[in-house]
Structure formats: C-alpha cells, structure tokens
Amino acid sequence: MTLNNFINIWIRKKHIVYLCPDKYYEDMFDLIDEINDGKKKIEEIIECTICAFIPDSCDFLVAYYLKDKLADAEVKHFYIGDGYMIVWIEEESEQ
C-alpha cells in the first residue's frame, strides 16, 4: 500500500496522526505540507522517541505511547513507511 492510497482510504476517519522518530521529524513537516496542499488534511504530528520501528514490537510500543499521550483515543490502524508511521486514531464517543 502506498502512502497516498493509505491517506485516501483513511482520511475519512476522525483523526489521522503522524508518528515518527525524532531523526525524521523535520522531514515530516514537508510531507504533511504536500498532503495538506492536496486538500487531505493532516491534523497533527507527534514526535516519538521510543519507537525504533522494530517489526515485532512496533505495534506494542506505539500503542503504549499513544495510550499515554491520547488517553481518550483508541489506536485503530498502523501504516509503517520509510522512517515514518501514520496512525489512525478514533476518539471514543461520549455516551
């Protein structure tokens, strides 16, 4: 799945977050600007210093990190790219 295909599929969801290790952090803003210029709105970027994209442990680390940062959100989907990760977040409804 390409980055653009992923965005096209998941942009309809409530919340899309970029999560990336700090060594890629500056580059992510350029990528987000390109996507936002194409009318695909990215809401925020979170700098992640704990996830080294180790395949067997990545989902656990990211879920743990986001649980701490976004207590009222549930991690729904991951897309691991070249040095970055997109996370689809669906906020819990207040019922």
PLM region descriptions:
Residues 1, 90-95:
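Short intrinsically disordered terminal tails
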Residues 1-16:
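Long, hydrophobic N-terminal alpha-helical segment
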Residues 20-89:
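Acidic, low-complexity, intrinsically disordered interaction modules
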